[in-house]
Amino acid sequence: MSKGTPSMGKRQKRTHAKCRRCGSVSLNIHTKQCTSCGFGRTSRMRSYQWQRKCKF
């Protein structure tokens, strides 16, 4: 096994596909879960308070 640049040429498969619910290209093909909206993991849309801008 070699590390580094020769190993990077073997990465040809797609990891993420287009999500049916949010439309972003963040649906993991192997786990069948969207990292953007949480599709496949939860019925609710994925949203957190730390994503929003703080109001003073």
Curated annotation (Swiss-Prot):
GO terms for biological process: translation. A zinc finger (C4-type) spans 19-37. One of its GO terms (cellular component) is cytosolic large ribosomal subunit. Binds 1 zinc ion per subunit. Keywords: Metal-binding, Ribonucleoprotein, Ribosomal protein, RNA-binding, rRNA-binding, Zinc, Zinc-finger. It comes from the Archaea. GO terms for molecular function: rRNA binding; structural constituent of ribosome; zinc ion binding. Its cofactor is Zn(2+). Zn(2+) binds at residues 19, 22, 34, 37. Pfam families: Ribosomal_L37e. Coiled coil: none annotated. Binds to the 23S rRNA. Belongs to the eukaryotic ribosomal protein eL37 family. HAMAP family: Ribosomal_eL37. This is Large ribosomal subunit protein eL37. The gene is rpl37e.
